[in-house]
């Protein structure tokens, strides 16, 4: 029988637009997502497939927030050490693999910024911010904006899974 192969060379055009297209397509499908019913956002193409390290980090974050299957289609022999570190971020992968299996919902969109909220097992939540604008941006994350009631007995702790920073 024949053996099928695929080409892992870098494409001539940037590929992050396809990541954003898949992300946008999958957002309204979250209501169908649960263990046993996974929305397939497509392959992880980061690392050597015509994407920057920042775009690779964004794709892994988005796919993890969507509880998507994490299937890498990049050429493993050509991944930089930085790309391997990004794609192997255990904390971000744990968000994807959380046993609750729920997909994030879009809680805020504006000025090129999306804020996603994903319920996790144990009553925790993951929050991700996507800058799909053309330059640097910032967003103020207030509990009410993220869907949390402003109560005195509510205590919030935040961890940056990419930078390691912690804030209470």
Specify the residue positions occupied by each region the protein language model found.
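Helix N-terminus capping/helix-initiation residues
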Residues: 40, 52, 80, 89, ...
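Solvent-exposed beta-hairpin/edge-strand motifs
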Residues: 144-164
């Amino acid at each position: 029988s024949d053996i099928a192969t695929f080409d892992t060379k870098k494409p001539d055009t940037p590929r992050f637009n396809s990541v954003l297209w898949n992300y946008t397509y999958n957002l309204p499908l979250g209501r169908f997502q649960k263990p046993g019913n996974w929305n397939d956002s497509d392959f992880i193409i980061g690392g050597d497939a015509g994407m920057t390290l920042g775009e690779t980090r964004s794709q892994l974050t988005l796919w993890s927030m969507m509880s998507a299957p994490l299937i890498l289609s990049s050429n493993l022999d050509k991944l930089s050490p930085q790309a391997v570190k990004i794609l192997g971020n255990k904390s971000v992968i744990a968000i994807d693999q959380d046993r609750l299996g729920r997909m994030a919902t879009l809680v805020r969109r504006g000025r090129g910024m999306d804020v996603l909220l994903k319920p996790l097992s144990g009553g925790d939540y993951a929050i991700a911010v996507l800058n799909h604008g053309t330059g640097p941006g910032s967003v103020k994350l207030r509990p009410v904006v993220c869907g949390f009631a402003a109560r005195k007995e509510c205590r919030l702790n935040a961890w940056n899974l990419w930078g390691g920073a912690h804030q209470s």
